Amino acid sequence: MTRTVPGPTDRVVVVGAGLAGLSAALHLLGAGRRVTVVEREELPGGRAGRMDLAGYRIDTGPTVLTMPDLADEAFAAVGTSLYERVELIPLHPAYRACFADGSSLDVHSGAEAMAAEVERFAGAAEAAGYRRLRDWLQRLYRAQMRRFIDADFDSPLGLLHPDLARLAALGGFGRLDARIGRFLSDERLRRVFTFQALYAGVPPARALAAYAVIAYMDTVAGVYFPRGGMHALPRAMAEAAAAAGADLRYGQPVTRLERSGGRVTAVVTDAGRIPCDAVVLTPDLPVAYRLLGRRPHRPLGLRHSPSAVVLHAGTDRTWPHLAHHTISFGAAWHTTFDELTRAGSLMSDPSLLVTRPTATDPGLAPPGRHLHYILAPCPNTDIGPGPAAWSDLGPRYRDTLLRELERRGLDGIEAAIEEECLVTPADWHARGHAAGTPFSAAHTFAQTGPFRPRNLVRGTENAVLAGCGTTPGVGVPTVLLSGKLAAARVTGVPGRRGSRPRSSPAAAGSARQSGDPALTGSGAAPRARGESAHRLAPAHQPPASSPDFPAAARQSPPPGSPPAGPTAPATEGRTG
């Protein structure tokens, strides 16, 4: 039995209307609590916000949605459904991977489509290895989900469960890169199933194999896009919460918490005082701890994940060979991780995520125009350039990235940009994110599960944390779970799983939208590294089938200014 908030918990204030806060609010409402949600911005979403710029509707946060049933659980808590409120479009391919040798691969979640694509790309032996890998990923997910991901921890003793032995038997405590190498010998394919470790802030060669569960979410469970953009998800969650009786108060920053002994008795905003029996705090950890007036002691300080530079570009043209999500891998893969996590330097041969949301939803841009989001991982401000350095470095790095994209086949991209938004670690820092990163604490072994900052804070009886900095961690699915787990700490009632029939996401094309009205080359041997064939080229089309990082954006103001538009408390990555 895990610990819960003692005493009365009828009135709950949730601080932050991001994905974590809205998930917590819906689960609390479903358990009969009276819920007030306070949000500093003028609309819901947190990092999964929206910026309107000259007719471009820009998602300021996560671009990848996986495992939508976890979001549906929150809707189900108040008797409604995600699939009734948001049209989810399955992405085929989920990603397109482009490599420095000129080859490309479409990544599909369907087993047969992906096996056929792997065989085209790397031969029958690798396709057989992919099938074995897929089976292993499914078993790994089943061993982890209920006990180690969708679970609260009060101590490391919570790990002692038969599923721990199952996880060990599956090789979950080995190294990720080595374990994937048991199934796939092609280095390019191994990258497709290990790059997700960057979400966890650990290079694949050092990450636990258990983190392959993130690859399961991306490559097996499927990737979706809400019509109207990712912001359609938190908007629908906020509407469902309001319909269930929540009091949502926007544009009200929290200034302090009132306490009596070990309990928080009220949340104070610049608009007034809100009495409470319990509070759920979803801001980034430094902000939450500052409000609480206490910081838990850790033998070692938290180690943070890499950050990201994101350029959001509204253009007068596109490059049709770009998929919705295209990963452009540099040749210097292992060097990249050393630069990001050890040397603290910008990538010398960058691996980039290019997202083209208008490939799926043209209504996100003016007629005849297109949106492209370019995400470049970079060091956080603890080990890399500090916030002040980015005032000059940001614009120069933006130019470097555009030149590199031109070299990789996006001819004329700089000239095509009509409107743009840029975010750097300085902006994350200005919004209160530790180490200037939206990806929070890295998922090292010492910062995972019961070793991650817990959602109950010692010395405070009735405050619970949610968001990417606490359990389970970074990413849209896990941030949604963090809200559910926080609600369970208040109510003592675990969120219900599978409590009612759900519509299939694949059938979501007929679902009604609520709220916002708008709401892979041949299998030839690779060329030598450094050869000039690295282009974002179209992939060979595979048979018909049946990459979160979180991003943020601002219209480029004077360097060092805080970002415009909605932002945090959490990803996706993959945060919320």
Residue ranges of predicted features:
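Extreme N-terminal leader/targeting segments of oxidoreductases
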Residues: 1-12, 31, 444-451, 498-530, ...
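N-terminal glycine-rich phosphate/pyrophosphate-binding loop and immediately adjacent elements
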Residues: 6-143
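Rossmann-like flavin
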Residues: 100-208
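Short beta-strand to alpha-helix junction loop
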Residues: 165-176, 218-239, 389-397
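A glycine-rich dinucleotide-binding beta-alpha-beta segment and adjacent secondary-structure elements
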Residues: 186-200, 347-353, 411-472
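Helical element adjacent to the flavin cofactor pocket in flavoenzyme catalytic cores
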Residues: 213-264
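Mid-domain catalytic core of redox enzymes
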Residues: 255-366, 507
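C-terminal segments that line or cap access tunnels to active or ligand-binding sites in enzymes
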Residues: 316-429
